[in-house]
């Protein structure tokens, strides 16, 4: 696979996702980081996004609820280069009916090389990083070259 670069702007497009048993933890994290997060563009799965917007007043672009396709919508935005970072407080102790969607979401975040936080500690590390406030170049798959090679 060949790679190219993509610029992540200083103003990030951040996806926020949380399983039911982790929503309160994500809401607390958002509240603790409200002054930073409100400077960025937020996206979320349906229930999570609405809860964040109600609790914090920060505008959130909400997708469908995760089990109804919201995880896949966020994944599509990642593949389109429209999401720069994923904060996903997932619940490792409880299975969810849309587990394949969760795996696909994490796979896409990895394929497209965006930062991912899966708990409060990693989310704190990301938001406190000097890179969070800066424009950053990341390596991403060169899809056009990939497609050309596949069509030969």
Swiss-Prot record:
UniProt enzyme class: lyase
Chain residues that bind substrate: 19, 23, 45-48, 65-66, 98
Organism listed in the record: Serratia proteamaculans (strain 568)
CDD domains according to UniProt: MGS (cd01422)
Any one GO molecular function term: methylglyoxal synthase activity
EC number, as in UniProt: 4.2.3.3
Record flagged with keyword Nucleus: no
Official protein name in the record: Methylglyoxal synthase
Role this protein plays: Catalyzes the formation of methylglyoxal from dihydroxyacetone phosphate.
Keywords per UniProt: Lyase
Gene3D superfamilies assigned to the protein according to its UniProt record, in alphabetical order: Methylglyoxal synthase-like domain (3.40.50.1380)
Gene: mgsA
Family (UniProt): Belongs to the methylglyoxal synthase family.
Single biological process term from Gene Ontology: methylglyoxal biosynthetic process
């Amino acid at each position: 696979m060949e790679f190219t670069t993509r610029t992540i702007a200083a103003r990030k497009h951040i996806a926020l996702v949380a399983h039911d048993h982790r929503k309160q933890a994500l809401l607390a994290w958002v509240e603790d980081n409200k002054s930073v997060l409100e400077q960025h563009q937020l996206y979320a799965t349906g229930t999570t996004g609405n809860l964040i917007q109600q609790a914090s007043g920060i505008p959130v672009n909400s997708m469908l609820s995760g089990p109804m396709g919201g995880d896949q919508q966020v994944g599509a935005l990642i593949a389109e280069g429209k999401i720069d970072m994923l904060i996903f407080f997932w619940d490792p102790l409880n299975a969810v009916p849309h587990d394949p969607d969760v795996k696909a979401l994490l796979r896409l975040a990895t394929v497209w090389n965006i930062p991912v936080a899966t708990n409060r500690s990693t989310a704190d590390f990301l938001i406190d990083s000097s890179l969070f406030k800066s424009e950053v170049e990341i390596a991403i798959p060169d899809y056009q070259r990939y497609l050309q090679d596949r069509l030969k």
